[in-house]
Amino acid sequence: MIAIIDYGMGNIRSVEQALKYIGAEHIVTSDKEEILRSDGVILPGVGAFPKAMEVLEERDLVCVLKEVCDIGKPLLGICLGMQLLFERSEELKGCSGLGLLPGEIRKLKVSYKIPHMGWNELRKEREFPLWNGLVDGSFVYYVHSYYADCPDEIVCGVSDYGMQVPGFVAKGNVFGAQFHPEKSGEIGMQILKNFQGVVEAWKSSRLSI
């Protein structure tokens, strides 16, 4: 069971429809116990980083997400959800994030139009489970104005937009996609299937203990 966290700022419906399409068992919830009972978690998001953190704090979801990380449960952040995984954002007056990944979220510093919106090539930087079955250079769909300034060792895929934009990041059981898998056609469906596979593997490992 994959829990899609509903905190009022996510692209919930499109993520839910994508999971239905690939046949992944899921629930949309903001309930702590349901999240902790799940086998994997997706944190979607659209909007402003500071407001999202404020809402997560108000709903007591920050501690839940940190607990999810601590117990090794697979966690996937999408778009703003990915950005929230980092330590801090400079958006507006600046704001602390969840601190599950090292790095800071910064405004895109490019001469191109902002937000970065549309299809872009995703190039492989290093292997990790969400690359399974994908061709290096596949096109994915972005909508964002900020990017993750983070250590190279957690960057698994990048796109060019006047600068290198981390598209895929990962550290341990924590995964992030700056682009929208749920809006990226069959490539995106494969990415979500790969996450489903990670979730199933984690569930099986827990059952065998």
From Swiss-Prot:
HAMAP family, from UniProt? HisH
Cite the InterPro entries for this sequence. Class_I_gatase-like, GATASE, Imidazole-glycPsynth_HisH
Per its record, the protein catalyses: 5-[(5-phospho-1-deoxy-D-ribulos-1-ylimino)methylamino]-1-(5-phospho-beta-D-ribosyl)imidazole-4-carboxamide + L-glutamine = D-erythro-1-(imidazol-4-yl)glycerol 3-phosphate + 5-amino-1-(5-phospho-beta-D-ribosyl)imidazole-4-carboxamide + L-glutamate + H(+); L-glutamine + H2O = L-glutamate + NH4(+)
Keyword entries, A-Z:
Amino-acid biosynthesis, Cytoplasm, Glutamine amidotransferase, Histidine biosynthesis, Hydrolase, Lyase
Q: Give the EC number(s) under which this enzyme is classified.
A: 4.3.2.10, 3.5.1.2
Q: How does it assemble?
A: Heterodimer of HisH and HisF.
Q: Which gene encodes it?
A: hisH
Q: What is this protein called?
A: Imidazole glycerol phosphate synthase subunit HisH
